[in-house]
C-alpha cells in the first residue's frame, strides 16, 4: 500500500544544500591551487608533461 512520505524540513534541506555547496567550494579551491602551482613551476606532487619545441629538425 502506497504511503506518502513525510515532508523534509527546511532546516534539513538547507543543511544538505550547505554541505553540497561546501564540497563544491573545496573542489574549486583545490583546482585553483593546483593550477597556480603548475603555472608557477612549484608543482611537485604529480607529473605534468611540458611540451618543448625542438628546433633541431
Swiss-Prot record:
Name of the molecule in the record: Large ribosomal subunit protein bL32
Coiled coil: none
Organism, scientific name: Prochlorococcus marinus (strain SARG / CCMP1375 / SS120)
One cellular component term from this protein's GO annotations in UniProt: large ribosomal subunit
UniProt cross-references to Pfam families, sorted A to Z: Ribosomal_L32p (PF01783)
Domain of life: Bacteria
Biased composition (Basic residues): 1-20
Region described as Disordered: spans on this chain: 1-23
Keyword GTP-binding assigned: no
Keyword line: Ribonucleoprotein, Ribosomal protein
Family: Belongs to the bacterial ribosomal protein bL32 family.
Annotated InterPro entries: Ribosomal_bL32, Ribosomal_bL32_plant/cyanobact, Ribosomal_zn-bd
Record lineage: Bacteria, Bacillati, Cyanobacteriota, Cyanophyceae, Synechococcales
Encoding gene (name): rpmF
Gene Ontology BP annotations: translation
Molecular-function annotations in GO: structural constituent of ribosome
The keyword Ribosomal protein is assigned to this record: yes
Amino acid at each position: 500500500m502506497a504511503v506518502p512520505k513525510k515532508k523534509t524540513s527546511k532546516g534539513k534541506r538547507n543543511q544538505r544544500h550547505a554541505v553540497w555547496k561546501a564540497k563544491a567550494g573545496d573542489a574549486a579551491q583545490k583546482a585553483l591551487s593546483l593550477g597556480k602551482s603548475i603555472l608557477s613551476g612549484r608543482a611537485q606532487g604529480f607529473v605534468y608533461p611540458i611540451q618543448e619545441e625542438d628546433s633541431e629538425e
